[in-house]
Amino acid sequence: MKLAQVRETHLLAGEWDILATLAFEEEPVDPRERLLDLVTGKIRKMPFVRDTNTIVPAMSRTREAHLAHPERRAYAFVFIDAKMGKGQEVMNHVMRYDEVVESHLLLGKSDVLAVLEFEKGIIPPVPERAAKIVTEEIAKISDITNTETLCPIRSIVKD
């Protein structure tokens, strides 16, 4: 089943199997209702889907300049825990790094989701580049208490 609202899918290894980005063409009257209908009415009814977790950011920042060719992009997703009341500051701070193309303030288990984008290449591999920016830069931000990084095995992005 193809869903027009699915903009990206990322194959992961670990606690989650797939991370998908959903978007609506027009601004819906009540986006939560449309999202609920999409997730419960279609995605959860797909064969082989056992469970879903839906993350809806309270606030987002994005960088306009993505790499030109989607087939050359590789991603890493960094879930960030911040000190009490510092989530928005951390969300803004991580946007200072060139590799961070999106930063989302979350309500729930993690405080911020940072999306890192790299040009594909094997030397050094993407997980190594992600580890370097996370451990040497992002995790050293004083208001961050913990990070969890997910590096997709494969990504499909609609343009």
Give the role of each language-model region.
Residues 1-159:
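A compositional/biophysical signature of low hydrophobicity enriched in polar/charged and small residues
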